[in-house]
Swiss-Prot record:
Protein name: Mitochondrial distribution and morphology protein 12
Gene Ontology molecular function terms on file: lipid binding
Biased composition (Basic and acidic residues): 81-96, 412-428
Species, as recorded: Candida albicans (strain SC5314 / ATCC MYA-2876) (Yeast)
Claim: Ribosomal protein is one of the keywords in the record: no
Keyword Flavoprotein: no
Length: 428
């Protein structure tokens, strides 16, 4: 199933381009720059006129993590009014990068109810029953669209049939939560290519409770439980983008020999030909839209095995293509940006300066991928709050009503004044 995107609605107004430019500029300013560059800034951003190809792979209920985010935001607002000692963290400011998931530690110190211990035990039993109800054995394995790890084997649905829960996967890297260990053993393939009846909400696929290295903190029963609305919906989509989006950056290249900052050379960098082919989730709940990239699609580009570089020119024309599947540099579970081209404008310089330009380009490409991974790759996401528009409309309506009421009062006052004037003239 696929649908068309009215891309022109995004490009007519330059507000979105300006917002993204400011966001990227702020992110680049927050990173630590190497000694050979300074004053990095994003000068221009444009979405382009070519929309991405979007294919719907699955329709179901939103992940529970999205509801937890809304609840945590609500608890945060209450905590800010009562006390600032609550250790709550907003997911919109970025999740805990070290833990690898978006659950927050909630410190609830209310001691009003003396029977909370019994309620906690009952709640734990209900949580265990809920996990059993979402057994992954009900999800059928379909067509394998993604190839996360050639050395690992994807378990079939039959392998889970005799057990109440799937076996624990061995972590690929003990020092961090690799996304392979979350997705691959539990079959994101089954979401993408499932053909039979299965669980309508495959949230356990991304449930970190199955990881041996991590344990989700228990949410206090005093917190409000997630409220599911009948209109809530989630789409698992395949996004294939090969458009004309471009980013312009300005940076100073430093030559630190024979002394630090001996030469400062401004360089203009034009980032174009961005290629994205990934699986993402788009969830709509309570007038909020959540977007998160889950994993990359394994394409078979003929020139993906090696970096391609065109001959550089001493006149400043420097074109370099960067690909994301170089085994020596790419060990992340997701890159989002698969291919990117950078054109640099530096004028007539020596060859040793050109070599430093290559370092700058590679640094910027890696930092751009890191920003996208940290901000919009699972377990991070971006949330677009649609309630702000409703609030603005309500304020406009109230303002119009107030203006209309004042106008009526002015009209009545005018009539009353005219009457008095007539009486005065008649008396005279």
């Amino acid at each position: 199933m696929s649908f068309d995107i009215n891309w022109n609605q995004l490009t007519i107004d330059d507000t979105i381009n300006q917002s993204i430019k400011e966001f990227l500029d702020q992110q680049f300013k927050n990173i630590s720059l190497p000694s050979f560059i300074s004053n990095l800034a994003v000068t221009d951003f444009n979405l382009g006129e070519i929309p991405p190809e979007v294919t719907i792979r699955h329709i179901g209920d939103p992940f529970e993590e999205f509801y937890e985010d809304e609840n945590n935001l609500g608890v945060m607002n209450e905590a800010n009014n009562d006390s600032k000692d609550e250790h709550l963290k907003n997911h919109g400011d970025g999740i805990n990068k070290d833990s690898g998931y978006n659950s927050q530690n909630l410190d609830d110190e209310d001691e009003d109810d003396e029977d909370d211990d019994e309620d906690d035990e009952d709640e734990e039993e209900e949580d265990e029953d809920d996990y059993d109800d979402h057994d992954l054995g009900t999800i059928n394995e379909g067509i394998s669209l993604l190839n996360f790890n050639e050395n690992s084997t994807t378990p079939s649905a039959n392998s889970f049939a005799g057990s109440a829960a799937p076996p624990l996967p061995p972590p690929l890297n003990p020092s961090r939560d690799s996304f392979h260990s979350i997705l691959h053993p539990y079959g994101v393939n089954s979401i993408i290519g499932a053909t039979g009846a299965g669980s309508e909400t495959p949230t356990n696929i991304l449930n970190q409770n199955y990881l041996s290295s991590r344990v989700l903190p228990k949410i206090s029963v005093k917190q409000k439980q997630p409220h599911h609305d009948d209109n809530d919906i989630q789409l698992i989509v395949e996004i294939n983008y090969k458009g004309d989006m471009h980013i312009n950056l300005l940076v100073n290249l430093l030559v630190n020999y024979p002394s630090p900052n001996f030469i400062s050379l401004p360089i203009k960098l034009h980032i174009t030909d961005i290629v994205i082919h990934s699986i993402a989730t788009i969830a709509y709940l309570k007038k909020s839209v959540f977007l998160s990239f889950l994993c990359d699609v394994d394409d078979t580009f003929p020139d993906f095995d090696s970096n391609v570089q065109t001959p550089t020119s001493t006149t400043g024309g420097n074109f370099v293509d960067y690909y994301s599947n170089d085994a020596t540099i790419n060990k992340e579970r997701i890159d989002i940006v698969k291919k990117i081209k950078i054109e640099s404008e530096i004028g007539e310089v020596e060859n040793n300066i050109l070599r430093n330009v290559g370092k700058v380009e590679k640094f910027l490409v890696e930092q751009l991928r890191n920003i996208l991974r940290d901000e919009i790759a699972w377990p991070s996401w971006i949330c677009i709050d649609m309630n702000d528009d409703d609030d603005e409309e309500e304020e406009e309506e109230e303002s119009e009503d107030n203006d209309g009421g004042n106008s009526d009062l002015n009209d009545n006052d005018g009539k009353h004044g005219d009457g008095r004037t007539d009486e005065t003239e008649a008396g005279e």
